[in-house]
Amino acid sequence: MKNIIKLAYVVLCTLVVSCSSFLDEKPQSDFMQEGTGTEDQESKYGSLADAQAELQGAYESFKADIFQSENYTIGDVQSDNCYIGGDGVAEQEFDLLKLTSTNYKVELVWSQYYSMAGTATSVIENTKMMDPTSTVAEERNRVIAEAKFLRAWAYFDIVRLWGDAPMVLDLIPTITAENLDKWYPVMYPERSATDKIYDQILDDLNEENTIRYLVSKNKGIFQATKGAAYALRAKVLATRGEKSTRDYTKVVEACDKVIAEGYTLVSNFDELWQPDKKFSSESIFEVYYTSDAPNWAYWVLLKEDDGSVTWRRYCTPTHDLVAKFDKEKDTRYASSILWKSVPYDTYWPADSYPLSYKIREKTSNIILMRLADILLLKAEALVELDRTPEAIRIVNSIRERAGFAPSSLDENMGQARGRLAVENERQLELYMEGQRWFDLVRNNRLLEVMQKHKDKDGRLLFAGLQAFRQLWP
């Protein structure tokens, strides 16, 4: 009887989700890949081409909301970089740092990350179960490695946003009354502890079993590479646990392995954002868009329908951010912010309105990882290792490209000032790349920075911000 009741519940949930999908533009996905496994664990793939097709489906997650728009909401709007721009209740919760569990954007981000992780798990497990004599080992291992990279990315963002969270690493067979007790906990899992999630992420980014099978840096391809995996590993190591317990030597080592892959800074910062300059020497992981498959972030951030902006766009630069740029020297200022006229707004004067300028056309790619990010992450780790002069030399190399003198910052400024120098440079260099919120949380600086953040009239916006707001509901 107990199994019959449980089975009825599962069927009912399936019916509800199915019916709701016709009504809800953004339905919440299940955690698992239901029906992709069997009790005797046979692969659903007839050939490696089937695995590659589903792997491509996992890559398509990078063209979903979580990477086309919500990455800016998470990383920039939740920080002192941007105002949201939108007037909806859900949008305003981000702007005010007062997220609720009923916010549809929170549900959207949750469901899309779990869909990405679930598809990657399906690829991993079904490819493992294939008859090894039916595939070329090198290609089979590469497919599994790329799927592990994608799963690691999804769970890294999940654990950074929610902390303890469900983690599903198994396939789900067809559910019957006989096997329901066995699979019910997998279908509806308890939250895994943060440390356990990080263990899994680092296992998926293991050098021996994953990274070795990925391709090396390959210009012009939207694909997981060794450099991208080392970069993700560096970010994970720089984030896990408390600052006092992190192994910053390993962060530096991971960053150095990225650098060893042969990436180089482009000489002109603006080239990174020119739509016809895709996959530069600096790009580590970049999502590709064309006129046939456009980047719709352009429509909400910048697009001008008739030669003038007639409604305020999303992710409006804040007064605090604009004030930090050296407008005379810093070439990144004009490359990152475009000033236009907007008929009405609450943040800026109508005749002088800043727009985020890194997504310039519908064919603009989205750069999710690039060398400057990793160099500055290495600098952050070096400061924590009390090697501040080395860190500031890296910061100065980034600043030199932006138009400053080669030694514009004093290498002997000391650790405390060095921390702030790296933090400030990451903010200006990586504005509108979804990094600022995570930088502040990672370095225990969110509350201090946001409690000093002001609106256009100089009023404090978040004077009473509480620590629990560093995780999502």
What name fits each language-model region?
Residues 29, 33, 69-91, 165-177, ...:
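Short, surface-exposed recognition loops and adjoining beta-strand edges that mediate ligand/DNA contacts
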Residues 1-30:
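Bacterial Sec-dependent N-terminal signal peptides
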Residues 86-109, 129, 177-188, 306-311, ...:
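Short, solvent-exposed loop/beta-turn-alpha elements that line the ligand-binding surface or hinge
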Residues 43-48, 52-56, 60-64, 88-162, ...:
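Conserved, well-structured interaction surfaces
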Residues 171, 175, 320-371:
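Flexible, polar/acidic helix-loop-strand segments at domain edges
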Residues 19-73, 255, 272-273, 459-461, ...:
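Membrane-proximal, proline-rich intrinsically disordered regions
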Residues 18-20, 45, 59, 71, ...:
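Long, intrinsically disordered, low-complexity segments
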